[in-house]
Structures are given as structure tokens and as C-alpha cells.
Amino acid sequence: MAGLEMGLLTMKKGEFSRFLFQPKYAYGDMGCPPTIPAAAMILYEVQILDFLDSGQVDEFVALSREEQNAVPLPRLLEVVNTVQIFGNRCFNQRRYHIAKDRYKEAMALLVSRESHTDAEKEKINAALLPLYLNLSVTQLHLENPHKALKYGNKALEIDSANTKALYRCGKAYLELGEYESAQGCLISAQAKKPFDGDINNLLREVTICFKDTLDKQKDMYTKMCRDFRGECK
């Protein structure tokens, strides 16, 4: 609605306002039956709890690849941070598909950057690390363990001792039924954080699943050997 959009543009974070709109700024002469009658004046009560200014993101994305690479790195990092914050909000609202898309958008902006110095590459990797971690956990929520593992491993390429990445890779391996690999990741994570409850609980779960699998394999091989001996008599 035109009136509400105009009103919101006048407000600040935390502000509470009431707007009374004439029909032409609300639902017009037709109204919105059956709830809103024709030519109705509308009273809105609005409070701005928080907002995200995406203006600089839109401006940056509209640039050509050459123009983006010419932009100072601090500005790029600001744009990436804004996109990441939006992704975090969506994640916290359990809107995982949208969160994934925002994280991937931020990641693409960083990956496409042409870095000419080691210092700049380090800053880009530092910004990529939380995005890879966020993508990994988001893919776990979306039940895509292969993709969760992909991004977890990308995070480990930047920081091989990152416990969040090790934990998420361990969880992805568990969901894929690759218990030995899961155990290896979680043991490495446990070595860094021996008293972390999430790591210890998941490691315990993996150990139980791994033992059950080995026991079943042992029983199967025992039965196969028994059947083979029977055929040879």
C-alpha cells in the first residue's frame, strides 16, 4: 500500500506511530470485501522493531564485474555482512531455503573478488569462513548432508581446527551412514573442546551406530562362512 510505504520511510528503529490513510492511499474506492468496506479510511498502528538497509547491496549488485572489483574491499565486506545478517534472520525464523540463498549470494560476492595481495585474500577467507559454516548447518536443517559436508570441508580448508566445521562434518557423515569418518571428525573436535556437550553427545551416538554396524557385519560374515562350510561338506 502506497500510504503505508510512505509512512514507513519516515520512521526510525524503535519508533511507534499511528497512520490514518485516506482511501486513495489505502484500499481505494473498492475496499477489500468482506473485511474492508468501500472507500474506507484505514488506521494503522506500526512499530519498527528492526530493519535492514539493503540499499548498498542493491547498488553493489547492479555494478559490472569490473566495477565490483574496483570497489574498496571494506565496502565489499560491508555489503557481504548485510546480506549475511539477512540470512541469519531468516535462519533464526526457520526460513532455511531463503537463508541458504542469502548465504550463497554473500559467498558468491566474495569468491568472485579478484584478490591481488595476500592480506586481501586473508580478509576474504575470514569473511568466507562463517558463511561456509552457516551454509553447512543450513543444509543440515534442509536434510542435505552431502551439501552440508561440502561446505563444512570448505570451512576446514580455511581453518582445519575449527570445531564447528568438524562437528557439522561429523553430523553430515553420521546422516550419510559413514560412521568411521564421522567419528574421526568428532574426535578431532573433542580434542579441541573436551567438555562440549554437543560434541560428546554426537560422538556417543556415532560410536553406538558404528558398533551396531560392525556387529551386523560380523554376524553377516559369520553366517556367510557357516553357509559356505555347509556347501563344502
Language model: regions and residue ranges:
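Alpha-helical adaptor scaffolds
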Residues: 96-165
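Alpha-helical segment of the N-proximal tetratricopeptide repeat
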Residues: 73, 78-111
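A beta-strand/beta-hairpin structural motif
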Residues: 1-39
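Intrinsically disordered, low-complexity, charge-biased linker/tail regions
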Residues: 204-207, 211-233
